[in-house]
């Protein structure tokens, strides 16, 4: 039975009744009497104790605990919160002659995000050169798409001010949210480490900054092979870039456990393939009444949530799941999902995604 702390008013009444039973005829309900003040004071103290007991009860269970207490649960189970990381990647610069680009040289994106060169680069010819730069500030904002223009903040001799991120920057991630941390903790408790089974690979992949969901395919290409794929839901494009795939593959191959300090990772003799899934959009066609902007947004959110929670590479999506998601939105007088009408399936290398909804 759930614990429900008594209200202050009920505690006051209970205390007054106790006084009345001990001192018949004392009438502690009279506000001008000393006994009434004592009853109020005692009830207030008791209310504070009950509220604290209620708070302690919430902290015992990770899913209801405050963030600070959730971190304590995570420490106990060996789950460390992923900290913010800075994006980095190759930047193509153009020089008019041989030159040296000193460490600390900075370039700026149009929206003000700044990137810095870690080590001095000596260039012995004119032309284009690829260098590696890192965002000054850690976080998701540092990730940059392909062919983005950056501009030198401080001019360097013989270096053209405009530079291009031909391959884009990746690796930037914000500090892990409490919800994502709780999800990883629950996974750790429900699927404890087991020497390299499929759940270990999922857990390892999700320990990498930016990774939110991951899947493992045992016997990917036969015995002794494993396939691992993942997505990064906090990005506008959730599908990982080659640099992200490389980071996850390196981490799974072997890494220092963040809690124990021991080297852990894939067992010897296992051939692991880490890959980025391909998007396979599902574009629903839905009739709703009334057709308001608010209902459209609510239905879109419900469908996106359903895709997040229920789809996986190599899985199937029944039309009834979309119908159930739409039916859960309040305010609809009528609706009909006219596509899909058949089960949507994906290969192990594909992930079904919520595409563009056509409103009828």
Swiss-Prot record:
Superkingdom assignment: Viruses
Cellular component terms (Gene Ontology): host cell cytoplasm; virus tail, baseplate
Regions crossing the membrane: none
The protein, known as: Baseplate protein gp47
Quaternary context: Part of a complex composed of three DNA circularization protein N, three baseplate hub protein gp44 and three sub-complex wedge (made of two copies of each baseplate protein gp46, gp47 and gp48) that forms the baseplate.
Induction: Expressed in the late phase of the viral replicative cycle. Expression of late genes is activated by the viral late transcription activator C.
Species of origin: Escherichia phage Mu
Protein's cellular compartments: Virion; Host cytoplasm
Pfam family, one: Baseplate_J
Keyword Kinase: no
Disulfide bridge partners, by residue number: none
Function: Component of the baseplate. Probably involved in tail assembly.
Family as reported in the entry's similarity comment: Belongs to the Mu gp47/PBSX XkdT family.
Listed PANTHER family: PHAGE-LIKE ELEMENT PBSX PROTEIN XKDT, PROTEIN JAYE-RELATED
């Amino acid at each position: 039975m759930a614990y429900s702390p008594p209200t202050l008013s009920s505690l006051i009444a209970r205390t007054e009744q106790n006084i009345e039973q001990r001192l018949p005829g004392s009438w502690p309900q009279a506000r001008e009497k000393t006994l009434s003040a004592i009853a109020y004071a005692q009830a207030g103290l008791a209310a504070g104790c009950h509220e604290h007991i209620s708070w302690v009860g919430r902290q015992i269970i990770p899913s209801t605990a405050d963030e600070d207490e959730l971190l304590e649960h995570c420490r106990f189970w060996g789950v460390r919160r992923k900290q913010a990381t800075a994006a980095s990647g190759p930047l193509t610069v153009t020089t008019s002659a041989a030159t040296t680009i000193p460490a600390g040289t900075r370039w700026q994106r149009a929206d003000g995000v700044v990137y810095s060169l870690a080590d001095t680069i000596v260039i012995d010819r004119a032309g284009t050169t690829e260098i590696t730069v890192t965002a000054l500030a850690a976080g998701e904002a540092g990730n940059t798409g392909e062919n983005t223009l950056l501009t030198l903040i401080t001019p360097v001799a013989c270096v053209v001010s405009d530079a291009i991120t031909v391959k884009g920057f990746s690796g930037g991630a914000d500090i892990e949210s409490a919800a994502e941390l709780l999800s990883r903790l629950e996974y750790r408790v429900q699927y404890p480490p087991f020497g390299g089974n499929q759940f270990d690979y999922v857990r390892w992949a999700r320990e990498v900054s930016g990774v939110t969901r991951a899947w493992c395919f045992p016997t990917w290409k036969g015995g002794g092979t494993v396939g691992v794929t993942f997505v990064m839901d906090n990005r506008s494009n959730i599908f990982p870039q080659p640099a992200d795939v490389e980071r996850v593959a390196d981490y799974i191959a072997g890494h220092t456990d963040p809690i124990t300090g021991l080297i852990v990772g894939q067992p010897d003799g296992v051939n692991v393939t880490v890959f980025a899934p391909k998007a396979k959009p599902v574009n629903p066609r839905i009739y709703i009444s009334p057709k308001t902007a608010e209902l459209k947004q609510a239905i879109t959110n419900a469908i996106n949530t359903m895709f997040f929670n229920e789809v996986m590479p190599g899985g199937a999506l029944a039309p009834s799941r979309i119908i159930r998601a739409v039916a859960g939105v309040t305010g609809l007088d009528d609706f009909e999902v006219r596509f899909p009408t058949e089960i949507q399936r994906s290969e192990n290398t594909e992930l079904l995604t919520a595409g563009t909804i056509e409103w009828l």
